[in-house]
């Protein structure tokens, strides 16, 4: 009984609390009771384009290759259960590629079995020169060779003699 009386008193106290609202508080300060949509009093004027004086014609560069219209002439793709594969393709605009890959077991725990790939690709440059690149990709990385790969210039004779002299006459520090 005492519990019911105490509970009823608490409910009455909570219900009797007055909410604090200061005089500056408004529930929605942006609400307008006399809302009217915007009405334009002016009528829009139509836009008339201004003619531009003619300019000098721009020279159009001819397209080098019509690669978007290339058709495949030859195509082959073979994947074997042991992980080896072979593929090749050739298009009618002179692009060709071929590659063979074979898994190589390098041992280890767990065993490392990377695929060693060997192949080539070729195309015709905008100047009409055929370009060919042969490559090997194995545990030593990607190793391309071909006429499109730049080569370093030869070492000048004076520097080669200086390096030979240093290697022969100056002992290495241990």
UniProtKB/Swiss-Prot annotation:
Signal peptide from the UniProt entry: 1-16
InterPro entries per UniProt: CHIT_BIND_RR_consensus, Cuticle_Struct_Prot, Insect_cuticle
Keyword Coiled coil appears in the UniProt entry: no
Pfam families attached to this UniProt entry: Chitin_bind_4
Residue stretches making up the Chitin-binding type R&R domain: 82-153
Keywords annotated in UniProt: Cuticle, Signal
GO cellular component, as recorded: chitin-based extracellular matrix
Any one GO MF annotation of this record: structural constituent of chitin-based larval cuticle
Role summary: Component of the cuticle of the larva of Bombyx mori.
Name of this protein: Larval cuticle protein LCP-22
Gene name linked to the record: LCP22
């Amino acid at each position: 009984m005492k519990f019911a009386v105490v509970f009823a008193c608490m409910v009455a106290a909570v219900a009797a609390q007055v909410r604090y609202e200061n005089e500056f508080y408004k529930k929605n300060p942006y609400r307008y009771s006399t809302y009217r949509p915007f009405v334009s009093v002016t009528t829009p004027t139509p836009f008339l384009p201004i003619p531009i004086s003619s300019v000098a014609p721009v020279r159009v560069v001819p397209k080098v290759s019509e690669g978007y219209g290339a058709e495949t002439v030859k195509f082959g793709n073979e994947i074997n259960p042991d992980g080896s594969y072979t593929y090749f393709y050739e298009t009618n605009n002179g692009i060709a590629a071929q590659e063979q890959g074979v898994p190589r077991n390098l041992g280890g725990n767990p065993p490392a079995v990377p695929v060693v790939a060997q192949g080539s690709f070729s195309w015709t440059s905008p100047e009409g020169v055929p370009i060919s690149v042969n490559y090997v990709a194995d545990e030593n990385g990607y190793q391309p060779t071909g006429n499109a790969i730049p080569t370093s210039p030869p070492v000048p004779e004076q520097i080669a003699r200086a390096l030979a002299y240093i290697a022969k006459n100056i002992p290495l520090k241990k």
